[in-house]
């Protein structure tokens, strides 16, 4: 008989970056619904809205070493453990290569790659200590294929894919490291991507139609994949990149 999911993460302690909205917020809500306690981290002050008995909020810049150190310390101070890290924070850029500025390039690398690396580095000693640590990196289909206007973004997400594989090999068997690669998601990220696009609704319809399932993913659906990779149900999986893209990359 299948075990219920309601308490599959009971006792687990997680750090979730980019937690104030979208996939990050949905992940915090799902992990806590399944029994986990969470350090919810974001630069956006809205992260404070998530505070409750199971969640402690941390405001900070994901790409600053002190933020990563504080997140790990807070997990131990408030919940006396650290089992899971979800590297979700990220920035998007839709701009042709020749129009991409030095500042654009540096900022995407800083947030998308440096931020994830710092949180992995600072958390790995604690994750490895108890022998069942889990890291879930939020990559993208853009890290596995080329897409027009996404040179900087594709490069950073490709780095996340390779970081995932490298850490999985380096830290097995005590820490499992996996990634989820979403396609287009109906969140603020999509709003950011379409900023300045004249006919937003027509563009959204076109983007949805490009996915075989015919729609954008919901934040809650990506959170389900993250929760799976953070749970004992995925105990044989490490170094994997799970495509959660409505079939986009199967074409």
Regions found by a protein language model. Give the residues of each.
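Active-site helix of classical SDR
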Residues: 120, 156, 164
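Alpha-helical segment proximal to the catalytic Tyr-Lys
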Residues: 125, 168-173, 235
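C-terminal substrate-recognition "lid" of short-chain dehydrogenase/reductases
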Residues: 79, 117-120, 132, 215-244, ...
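Substrate-binding pocket helix/loop in short-chain dehydrogenase/reductase
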Residues: 96-97, 101-109, 135, 207
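Residue(s) in the substrate-gating loop at a strand-loop-helix junction
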Residues: 140
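Conserved glycine-rich cofactor-binding loop
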Residues: 13, 20-21
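Active-site loop immediately N-terminal to the catalytic Tyr-X3-Lys motif
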Residues: 98, 145-151, 214, 232
């Amino acid at each position: 008989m299948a075990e219920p999911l309601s308490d599959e993460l009971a006792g687990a302690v997680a750090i979730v970056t980019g937690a104030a909205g979208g996939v990050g917020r949905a992940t915090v809500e799902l992990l806590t619904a399944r029994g986990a306690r969470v350090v919810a981290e974001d630069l956006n002050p809205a992260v404070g809205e998530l505070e409750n008995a199971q969640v402690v909020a941390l405001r900070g810049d994901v790409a600053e070493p002190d933020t990563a150190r504080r997140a790990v310390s807070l997990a131990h101070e408030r919940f006396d453990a650290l089992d899971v890290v979800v590297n979700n924070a990220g920035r998007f850029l839709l701009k042709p290569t020749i129009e991409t500025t030095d500042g654009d390039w540096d900022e995407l690398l800083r947030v998308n790659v440096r931020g994830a690396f710092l949180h992995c580095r600072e958390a790995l000693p604690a994750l490895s200590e108890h022998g069942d640590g889990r890291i879930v990196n939020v990559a993208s289909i853009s890290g596995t294929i080329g897409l027009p206007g996404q040179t900087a973004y594709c490069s950073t997400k490709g780095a996340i894919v390779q970081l995932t594989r490298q850490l999985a090999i380096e830290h097995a068997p005590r820490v499992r490291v996996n990634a989820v690669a979403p396609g287009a998601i109906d969140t603020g990220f999509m709003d950011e991507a379409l900023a300045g696009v004249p006919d937003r609704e027509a563009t959204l319809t076109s983007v949805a139609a490009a996915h075989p399932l015919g729609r954008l993913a919901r934040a809650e659906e990506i959170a389900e994949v993250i929760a799976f990779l953070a749970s004992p149900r995925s105990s044989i999986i490490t170094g994997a990149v799970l495509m959660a893209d409505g079939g986009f990359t199967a074409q």
